[in-house]
A protein has these predicted regions:
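General small-molecule cofactor/ligand-binding pocket signal
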Residues: 11, 49-51, 178
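Catalytic-core segments of class I nucleotidyltransferases/pyrophosphorylases
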Residues: 74-75, 82, 88-95, 108-111, ...
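Conserved beta-loop-beta/alpha segment of the NTase-like Rossmann-fold superfamily
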Residues: 36, 40-121
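Short, acidic, metal-binding catalytic loop of nucleotide-sugar glycosyltransferases
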Residues: 15-21
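Residues at the starts of beta-strands that form the adenosine-phosphate
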Residues: 9, 22-24, 47, 100, ...
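Single conserved hydrophobic/aromatic residue that forms the stacking wall/gate
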Residues: 1-12
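Solvent-exposed polar/charged
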Residues: 3-4, 18, 44, 68, ...
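Short beta-strand/loop segment that forms part of the nucleotide-sugar
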Residues: 22-30, 51
């Protein structure tokens, strides 16, 4: 787990807590003893439960460990993603749109640092673009999920959560997107982004 500290604060959990989330469940595998010990000794105003993943099952497979425990729509997040958003608004958006899963996606603008060549027939050049600029939505790794998804997870299946979503989408289920700005998403899994995030949060304190 890579829950980020700024000073002595647990960033991800604090953001959810600020919007009224007080019950957290962590699916733990690597160094789970250390993680449990830390939270058991921590003075906190929220509850943390643990689900032990004995064999790594991907970002989605571990949800099968929560069967029978989830009774309402819930936030499901990777442990290296921090969003500067109104989680209450996202939750209401999910419910009002009747989604089975709502994926929170960030707008992204990217300039390709090279000239791009499109290949035509017989090795010819079909088109050339010098350092094209792209605009797209990217998955932040944060979702709002209906409890039904947990109950329908296959026991012991190794699967990423985006693949779980794709399975439902192909079956005709309603899956939606909540778009956020690029600046609202901080990916702590990238060292450069982690440093940017630290500076941003420290400036907010």
């Amino acid at each position: 787990i890579s829950e980020c500290l700024v000073g002595s604060e647990m960033c991800i959990r604090d953001r959810f807590r600020d919007f009224g989330c007080h019950n957290f469940t962590m699916i733990v595998n690597y160094k789970k003893g250390m993680i449990k010990s830390y939270f058991n000794e921590l003075e906190k105003d929220y509850n943390v439960d643990f689900a032990d993943e004995e064999v790594f099952m991907g970002t989605g497979g571990g949800l099968c460990l929560l069967k029978g425990k989830i009774k309402a729509p819930f936030f499901f997040t990777n442990c290296d993603t921090l969003l500067d958003v109104d989680f209450g608004d996202i939750y209401e958006y999910h419910k009002s749109h009747g989604n089975l899963v709502t994926m929170i996606c960030a707008f992204k603008h990217y300039t390709v640092p090279y000239g791009v060549v499109e290949l035509g027939e017989n090795g010819s050049i079909a088109a050339m673009r010098e350092k094209p600029e792209l605009d797209f939505l990217t998955n932040t790794g944060v979702y709002v999920v209906e409890p039904r998804v947990v109950e329908e997870m296959r026991d012991g299946e190794k699967i990423g959560f985006p693949d779980v979503i794709e399975r439902y989408r192909r079956a005709g289920e309603k899956v939606g997107v909540y778009p956020i700005s690029e600046s609202s998403w901080m990916d702590m899994g990238q060292l450069e982004e982690l440093e940017k995030m630290r500076r941003k949060l420290e400036n907010q304190q």
